[in-house]
Each structure stands twice: as C-alpha cells, then as structure tokens.
Amino acid sequence: MTDSPDRLIATDLRNEMSQSYLEYAMSVIVGRALPDARDGLKPVHRRILYAMYELGLTPDRPFRKCARVVGEVLGKYHPHGDTAVYDALVRMAQDFSMREPLIDGHGNFGSVDNDPPAAMRYTESRLRPLSTNSLLRDIEAETVDFIDNFDGSQQEPTVLPARIPQLLINGSSGIAVGMATNIPPHNLGEVIDGAIALIRNPEITEQELMQIIPGPDFPTGAQILGRSGIREAYLTGRGSITMRGVASIETMEHPGRPDRDAIIVTELPYQTNKAALIERIADLVNDKKIDGIADIRDESDRDGMRIVIELKRDAYARVVLNNLYKQTPIQSNFGANLLALVNGTPEVLTIKKFLTVFWEFRIETITRRTRYELRKAEERDHLLQGLLIALDNLDAVIRLIRGAADTASAKTELVEGFSLSEVQADAILQMQLRRLTALEADKITAEHDELQTKIADFQDILARRERVNAIIEEELEQIKAIHATPRRTVIVQEDGELIDTDLIANDQALILLTEQGYIKRMPASTFGTQNRATRGKAAAKIKDDDGVEHFLSCCDHDKVLFFSDRGVVYSLNAYQIPIASRTARGVPIVQMLPIPKDEKITSLVSVSEFDDDTYFIMLTKQGYIKKTALSAFSNIRANGLIAISLVEGDQLRWVRLAKAEDSVIIGSQKGMAIHFKADQDELRALGRATRGVKSMRLRSGDALISMDILPSQVVANIAVGSEDEPDEDLGGDTDAILEESDNPGPWLLGVTMKGFGKRVPIGQFRLQHRAGLGVKAIRFKSKDDQLVALHVVNADDELMIVTNRGIIIRQSVNDISPQSRSATGVRVQRLDADDAIAAVALVPPSGEEELAEMSESEES
C-alpha cells in the first residue's frame, strides 16, 4: 500500500526535533514532574486522592485493596504504568517520607531500610482525616475547575481546593527536563502560623517569616546544622541544608568485661536508608578508613530506631563520631530547590512567595465557594417564595389547579395568574398535601427568613476582602487545632556559624556539671529565693555513684570556659548547653566537648567580653598560681587550648577573673585564708604556657579548697600585714553577730561541708605577701567538718548552694549572719545524713537590674 502524497508533510528535521522535544519537555514539566504551588500535588497524586474520594474511601469507611484504587486511577484518570501509580500511593502513606501522610495504609508499606512494600493485591488503604479536611473538602462546591480526562469519559479537577499550604508541609521532589525540584517538608503548625502572619501583615519580610517558620521539619526528625542554608533557601529559593542524625555516647556495661563506650544513633537524616548506612559503616571499618569501631548492630524495633556502634576500649568516642559525620550519611545535605508551577509556569519561589500563592488561591476558592452557596441559597429561596405565594393564596391556587385541563395548562395559569416563574410553578404543582398544614407553612417561612440572612452574609463576604481573609484564618486555625504536631527536627548552631544573639534572650542561667560528666543548663528563675536553713529543691537526678561537682551562675549570652585538670581550656556558648528541667540528669559533656576519658573539668568560668585589662587567675592543686590576660583566650580551638603548664602530679583546680588592681583570697580545708594583691609586684602576668608561682604555704594534712577575687575599690581600705604578725585573737564572743551598720561589706562568705556558713568583714583579712600561711577564717563545730567554699559577697547578692545529692537552695546573702573570723557560723542548709555541701555559686544580677543601675548612675 502506497502512501498518498497528500498525507506527507515536508519539514526540516532540525525544526521538527526542536519542536517535538519542546512539547515533550513541557508535557513532563506540567503533567508529571513538578507540583502545583496551590495544592502542592503532582497530577498522579491528585488523581489518586480524587479517585479514592470518589470511591468513598474516607476515614470513617473501611479500607479497600490498593489494587482497586490503582485500577480506578488507571482506568479513569492516569493511563500510565500501574507500578508508578502504586509507588506514588505508597509514598503518601509512609510516615517516614511524608511529614503529614495523606493516605492511611494497612499492611506492609515499606520501611526506612528501603524494604519494598507488599504487592498491591495484599495492601489496603483509605484517606486520612487531613486529606478530607484540608484537601478535598468543598470540591463539589465549584471551588476549582474540572477538565475532561484522557478519553473524555470523566471529569477530573485541575487542582484540589487545599485549605493548607500542602507543598510546604509535605514537600516534593521531581526531575523534569532541564529542571528539578526538591522542596523540604515543614511543620504544619508553623506553616499555618506563617500563613496567618502574612494575611495579617502583607508587608511582612522573609526574615520575619523565618522567626515563625524557623526551618524544615523532617518526618524522621534528626537535626539541622546552622541556619545559613535555610536562610539562603528561603530568601532565594535555592540552598543547601545540612542534616545530621541524632547520636549520643553511652557506656556499655558487659558483665565480666571492661566497660566500653558506644555511639547510639536514634534518628537519621531525611531519606537516609538505614540498612545502606550500616553497610557503609561496615565497609569503612573493613577498609581501615574509620578506626576504633569494634561492632555495629541494628537494635531498632517498634518503639523506635537504635543503631549501636560499639567502640574499642582505646577509641576516642568523639573522634569516631566526627569521622562518621564526615564519611557517612549520618550527616548529609538537603539541596533545596523550591521550584513549583505557578499558573502553569515553572517558578523558583521564596518562602513568602509560597505563602502568597497559597493565600491568593484560598481567596479564589472561598470566593467561588461563596458564589456557589449564594446561588444555591437564592435558588432555594426563589422556590420558597413561590410556595409562600401559593400558601397566601391557597384557595385560589387549589381552584386553579382543579379547574385546569392538564399539568401544562395548570403551570401556565399559575405563571400568568400569580407572576411566578416556571420553576416556582413546578414546585407548587409538586408540593405534597401535607405541606398545606399550618406547621409546614411556618417551617417554610422560617427557612425563607434563614436563607435571607445567609444570602445577605454571602453577599457581604463577596463585597469585603477582610471577610474572606477572616474565613481563611478561621479555617487555618481549625485545621491547626486538629492536626498540628510538635516539631521533630531540632535546629542547632553549626560550629563556627555566627548567629544573631538578639534572637536569644540573655536570661540568667545555672550550669550544673556532675562528677560523672553530665551537664545541663537551667533558668535561674527555676529556683526562687528560700529562707536560710531550709532543705532546698532537687536540681538534678543524681545516681548513687554520681554527685554535683561544678556549679556556675551566668547569662545565656556568656561564653562558658571549661578548664581541665590537665591545664587545657575548652569553650561553649552558654545557650549551646542543652536546657533541662530541675530533675533531669543532663547530657554527657563528651557529646559537647572533645574531652579525653582521663581528663576532668575542674573549673567553669563565664566570660562576656575578652579584653586586655582583665586576667585569668589560675590556681593548681599544689598551690601554684598564675595570672594571664583574658585576651589570650579569645580564640579557643574546637579541641581546646593550653591554659597553664603543669609539672607531673599537679592539676589545675581553680580559675577566676580579676583586674590587675584586685586582690586574691585563697582558702584551705582547715579554715585558713591568705589575702594578697594581684598587681605586677606580687603576681606578674605570664603567658599561657607557663607554670606560675607559689601561692600559699600549707600545714600538714591541709589542702586548698577555694579562691576568689576582691575588687580594687575595697583593697585600698584594707590594712597591710606581714607574715611575722601573729593571727590575732579577735576576742569577745566568737559566735556573736556583728552589726551590719559597722561592717557595710563586702564580706568573705565561708561555707562548710556540714552546711554551716557565715559572712566575715573583708577588713579582718589583712593583706600579706604570697606564699604565707595566712590567717584563720573559720572555726568548726565538729572535727570532721571542713571548709568547701570561700566567696567575696555583697549585701544584695544571692547565692546558690548545691549538695552532693543535687539539692539546690537559693538564698540571699543578707540571710546569713555576719560574724568574726573565729566564729563557727550559722546553719545555711539543712542536710540529709548522707549528704554534704558540694559547691556554692553567686547569682549574677539580671539585665533589668543592670539597666536600672546604669540609668541611676546617668541621672546622678
């Protein structure tokens, strides 16, 4: 058979290839790969949801076989492969793929190990409440356009009347021709709050929206490192977001064998294959690319994920974990590309543009829904008006109908005789006799009045944009109240990332570090001021073999410096330390700082500014003291910095901040104290890698316990003594309370292990030269008591006292009686029989108090 010449079209091959490929590309972009910015769905997902809705698979109905759904979609709306449709259905049911799943699956729908789902003939599904409430509701109310399906036998919606910004909530990914999209999922409650904020303030900026929507919220939880990638994605539509799994370091106890550290992974980054990750780690260990791993096993169960990476005895857990972050998908990047269809055209969207497109779409759908409801109400009211006319002229209507030859003539006479429309005349002719009763007439009148009110309301909505916006807000709030869930993904500060501290309140905080190395941060407001000699509140869940070792009061914007017994200093921002409740144990400090097992934190210091006029005074266990400029510690590396050079057997124990004009007071267990200046003559400044000089001479069996700094303003009024002068007897009643009017302060506060304490006027501690014995600071009530803390305090100070069992009491310094050096003190905290005072810390003044003091000084 030969082709007719009329059927052959001569064309240039290059033009034909170009045109055909362009048509194919646009078909893929619009009809397959990219989601619509309005409802956040690709055509296949939209067709699945609509087909399930048409099948009646609502949340209150039984499950149906997925094969039935797939067949419905293929036969009516989506003439492609059944595997593609089933895969799309499965993904919408996976809680590890969708932040808010749209389909409720029954059966095996796959796993994070990339296990395939069961065949569609075995699995069942139905719609979730979120789908019916927020995507498919009002679809019959002419809210969206419908078009013919592929063969013209059915109608399908071009978009679903979404009540939420579904594209932001569940995200999307797809590869088209020449372009791709990769939109991360977000928290439903946060996105709704952002949409409401935009409606209330259309001029809101992307930066302000980021305060409401801080970042993606992945279904698998995990962490996001830093905000720079989020900021770039939200402002430009493209950005790289670093995700990191949640891992902790635990000690594994093996009966009969030494304990070992293990890395426990409980959450993985979004779209990470758990089985492939474990295989990857095993390959790296076998290839000697990661050292220190002895065993790896998957202990995940129905209660959650748990990957156990057991380490060798000599392995440093933090180093191994950092290698895992670097070489495995435990840390990976999400390449955000916020591309979606807007009016059928691919467009890269910012966070504000996303919400604006949704807002405009909601205005359109509510306007169309209101017009539909108005039309239906007017049509119904039109019928009721005809019925009311008939009831008002009941006898005449009955006579007319009885006298009419047939229905058509009765209809014509009704239209002409009572000025009715044909629709009204039909309604009268179809009216049942029972509706002629007085009760039915009252019902018709009441319905007419109600419809008149509704019609006026619908007309008001169409006339006023603010009414439409109020309805959008109300519907968003309703969905949030029902479907919002807490955020799963935690956004943490990335190492070296600069953040705006204006976004973090500079609140007072307490930092607690236990002997076993657990650290936590608590708001100072957790502990209200209590009376002296009360028991206090539990501040930590302390195990029997653990106790509180360090206790620091600071502000959240401060840098917290951790000094170890080896003379190394580490640094953290106070707000980086996880905040915890009073009774929480905290987190292992090895998760936050690269501290070797045989190294111990011995001192915590908070710093607000690193300047040249301030110094660190460091004191070692053997009594060596050193002064080094604070500016030398302004750039502390991640793995720490040498703070002092130590001889074998010595340890760095105490570190304080001081000015060159200040003085130093050092106390010992047996109640002795030495007071000397910190100036260049007595204690010259040294570099970091130096040892220091001798501070205090100790008697046999005594040891240093504390050091504090006395401000220069007070030092000028203190007498200077010599080492040869005897420790004078102050005479009189040694436990007598001193008059505060005669001793305005500051005082030296001493607290003993047994819970006794007192305030001693600083003037009773004469200035001496270093390396002396010092003078008596306190007399003990019992021989087994000893001094545990010495602090310089003022009358308006507050202090926190913590015990070995984690009990904390907060009290005012004024509640502790001022006494002489030779007094035994008063009870400052009631202790249990097996408890003892562990540490004492002063509470810094709040920001409000500081501002008040500044304003008073300016006024004076």
UniProtKB/Swiss-Prot annotation:
Localization of this protein: Cytoplasm
Motif (GyrA-box): 530-536
GO molecular function, one term: ATP binding
Record-linked SMART domains: TOP4c (SM00434)
EC number of the protein: 5.6.2.2
Matches recorded under InterPro entries: GyrA, GyrA/parC_rep, Gyrase/topoIV_suA_C, Topo_IIA-like_dom_sf, Topo_IIA_A/C_ab, Topo_IIA_A_a_sf, Topo_IIA_dom_A, Type_II_DNA_Topoisomerases
BP GO annotations: DNA topological change; DNA-templated DNA replication
Catalytic residues as annotated in Swiss-Prot or TrEMBL: 122
Quaternary structure note: Heterotetramer, composed of two GyrA and two GyrB chains. In the heterotetramer, GyrA contains the active site tyrosine that forms a transient covalent intermediate with DNA, while GyrB binds cofactors and catalyzes ATP hydrolysis.
Protein name per its UniProtKB record: DNA gyrase subunit A
Source species: Synechocystis sp. (strain ATCC 27184 / PCC 6803 / Kazusa)
